[in-house]
Amino acid sequence: MREEDIRSTAGHGTSNKDWWPNQLNLRILHQHSEKANPMGPDFNYREEFKKLDYWALKEDLRKLMTESQDWWPADFGHYGPLIIRMAWHSAGTYRIQDGRGGAESGAQRFAPLNSWPDNINLDKARRLLWPIKQKYGRRISWADLMILAGNVALESMGLKTIGFAGGRADVWEPEEDIYWGSEQQWLGRDRFGEEGKLEDPLAASEMGLIYVNPEGPGREPDPLKAAQQIRETFKRMGMNDEETVALIAGGHTFGKTHGAASPSHLGPEPEAAPIEEMGLGWKNSYGTGKGGDTITSGLEVTWTSSPTKWTSNFLWNLFGYEWELTKSPAGAWQWRPKNGAGEGTVPDAHDPNKRHAPGMLTTDIALRVDPVYEKIARRFLENPDEFAKAFARAWFKLTHRDLGPRSRYLGPEVPEEEFIWQDPLPKRDYDLIDEGDIAELKKRIQASGMSIREMVMTAWASASTFRGSDKRGGANGARIRLAPQIGWEVNEPEQLRPVLETLEGIQQEFNRSQTGRKRVSLADLIVLAGCVGIEQAARNAGFEITVPFTPGRVDATQEQTDVESFSYLEPVHDGFRNYLKRKFSVPAEHLLIDRANLLTLTAPEMTVLIGGLRVLDCNWGRTKHGVLTDRPGALTNDFFVNLLDMRWKWNATDDENVFEGRDRATGELKWTATRVDLIFGSNAQLRAIAEVYASNDGQEKFVQDFVKAWTKVMNLDRFDLLVKK
C-alpha cells in the first residue's frame, strides 16, 4: 500500500449507523467488557478497597485543598469549591426515571460528560486529584475518589457530613446506553413537548447541563419560570423541595462562578482539543487564562463574604438585599444588590486588594420568589443548624443515590441510619431453609394447583423490576405484594393476587410447622415457584433439570417502601412479556433493548429468555402473539424453529405492532406476533443467535442457556451472594 493511498484507518469510514440510523443498537448490551478493562478478570475492587488506608487518603485530600498550584491557582486559596462542583456534577447526572447517570461508574472521565459545557474546567479538578489517585492506585476508584474528595472539601470548610460509602467500581469506556437527549447543539432545548413537558427519561433541562440553565430557562432571566424547571428537574433526580433548597443554598455557600470575559476566548472541549493539550480542554486565551481571568459558565458571581466556610451567609444575602438584573463581563444574565448595596463585602478570589458586592443567579432568586421554596429557605435562615443537617443529608443522598442498597456500602464512615430512599430491607432473624426443606417446599408448590404460567410469570414480575443502573428493584423484599407493585397493570393484579395468596399459604403452613428458628420468606418462595415451573416445563419437553436456587431473600414491609419512589420502577413496556402500556414513538424492539440493558442482559441472554417465555405462554393478557408453538408450557425451542421457518409469510396488520404469519401455500393464518418477536428473525445479529437455538442440535443448549439467563435475573439483586464471592 502506497502511503498516499492511506485515507483512514480501521474503525473509521462510513458506519452501519450512518447507512441505517434506525438500526438496533445492540452494542449497549455488550459494553464494559473485560477486553476494555486493564485490571483483568480476577480484579475485585471491593477487596482492594478494604486494603485502603482510608484515613491517610482523607488526610492527603485535606492537604490538597489548600496547596494551590501555579498551573491552576485555587480560588480564595482553597480548591474545596471546585472539588465540590466536580463531585456534585459526577453524581448529579442521576435521574430516577431509569436510574441511569450518577457517580457510580466514574463516567465523568469520558465523553460526553467530560466535554459538557456544564463541566467546563472540571478536567482541572480531576488533574489536581491525579497525584493522589496515582499514590493509592487500585485501592480507590476514580468514582469513589471524586465523591470522597467532595466530602473532604465540605469537611475542610466546616460542614459536618453524615458519612461516606465506597464501592463504586470504575468503567473504562464511555457509557453508550444513556440517552442524554437528541439535540445536536449544546444547550439545545428540543426535549420539551408542545405543552412544556420534559421528555422522559431526561431530567436536565438543556443538552449538556447537569440541572437547569442558571441564567433561566433558555437564558430568559425569569426566576419564577426557573423555579418551575428546578422543581421538575430535581424531582426527576429524586429530590423533594426541601432537599432542593438545601442543596442549592448549601452548594452556593461556597466558591464562585467564572465569567471574566466572553466564552469566545475558550478553545475546544477535551474531546476536541489538540493532542498536545493532553486531555485538557477549554484553553483560555483571555489574559493569563487562569486565576482571575478564568472563564467557565460566563457568569461572574460570588455569593457570600466567606466563600470557603460553611455559613448561612448565602441565605442572609438572598433575603437581606433587594436584587436587580445585570450582566457579567461575559454578557450573561445575573443579579446584583440594588443601589450599590453590599459593595465591598465579598473578597476577590485572587487579589487581596480587591473587594466586590455579592451576586446571585436567576436560579438563586428562584428560591426567594417561589412561595414554597421561600418558606423553606427562610426557615433554614432562621435555623442554621437545621440547614446544615438538611444539606448534609441531601448531599449524602445526592452522592449515594445510585450506589444501591446499604449492603453494597464499604468503608468506616458508612452512616448507621437507614434511609427510605435506600429501599431498606429487614435483617434476617431466622435460619435459612436447607436442601431437604427446598425439596419439601417444591412438592407443596407442585401440589398447589398453580400453573406453569402463573409460577413463571409471578417470579419474572418480582425479579424483573431490577435496574442495573441504580441497583434498585428485584425479587428480594417481595415488594410485588406491596403498593405500588401489587396494582401495576403489567403485573395483572387480578391474576397475581390469587397466586400470592397461594404462596403465602404455603409459607405460613411451612413456618408454623417448624420447631426451631428456620423460616422461609415469601420472596424466596416466589423465586422457588418459578424454578418449579421451569423444571416442569423442561420435563414437558423431555429434559430433567434442576434450576439453581439460593435462599436468603427477606420480606420488606410497606413502611420500608416509598410508594412514590417505587412508582418509577413500573415497567411501561416489557418486551419479555410482550407488554406495552400505551403506544410509544419509539419502536417496541428498541424498548426491548432498553429493558434488557437495565437487566444487564447480553444479546444471547435476551434472545434465549424471549424464546423461553414465549413458549411458556408468559405474555401479558394471555395474548398469543409470539407463542409460536403447539405445545405451550413445554420448554422447547419452537419459538425459534417456527420464527425462522420459511413456510410462514409474515404480513403487517392495521395494528403497527402486530403481524400475521400465514402459510405461504394456502394463506391460512397460523401465528400472530409483535415487533419484539419478529426482530429475532429480522435483525441480522439477533437472527444469527436465534439460528443457534433453532438448529436441530439447539434444543438442549436452549434449555441450558435459558436456565442460566433465568437464574441470573432471579439473582440480580442478591448482592449478598456477590459479597460472598
From Swiss-Prot:
Enumerate the Gene3D superfamilies for this protein: 1.10.520.10, Peroxidase, domain 2 (1.10.420.10)
Task: Please report any disulfide bonds recorded for this protein chain, giving both cysteine positions.
Answer: none
Keywords of the record, alphabetical order, are: Heme, Hydrogen peroxide, Iron, Metal-binding, Oxidoreductase, Peroxidase
Q: Which Pfam families match?
A: peroxidase (PF00141)
Requisite cofactors: heme b
Q: Where is this cross-link: Tryptophyl-tyrosyl-methioninium (Tyr-Met) (with W-88)?
A: Y211-M237
Binding note for cofactor: Binds 1 heme b (iron(II)-protoporphyrin IX) group per dimer.
InterPro entries, per this entry?
Catalase_peroxidase (IPR000763), Haem_peroxidase (IPR002016), Haem_peroxidase_sf (IPR010255), Peroxidases_AS (IPR019794), Peroxidases_heam-ligand_BS (IPR019793)
Which residues catalyse the reaction?
H89
A GO cellular component annotation in the UniProt record: cytosol
Q: How is it modified after translation?
A: Formation of the three residue Trp-Tyr-Met cross-link is important for the catalase, but not the peroxidase activity of the enzyme.
- List, alphabetically, the HAMAP family matched: Catal_peroxid (MF_01961)
What is the protein's quaternary organization?
Answer: Homodimer or homotetramer.
Extract the NCBIfam families matched here: cat_per_HPI, PRK15061.1
Task: Please give the name of this protein.
Answer: Catalase-peroxidase
* Organism of provenance: Symbiobacterium thermophilum (strain DSM 24528 / JCM 14929 / IAM 14863 / T)
Q: What is the lineage of its organism?
A: Bacteria, Bacillati, Bacillota, Clostridia, Eubacteriales
Gene behind this chain? katG
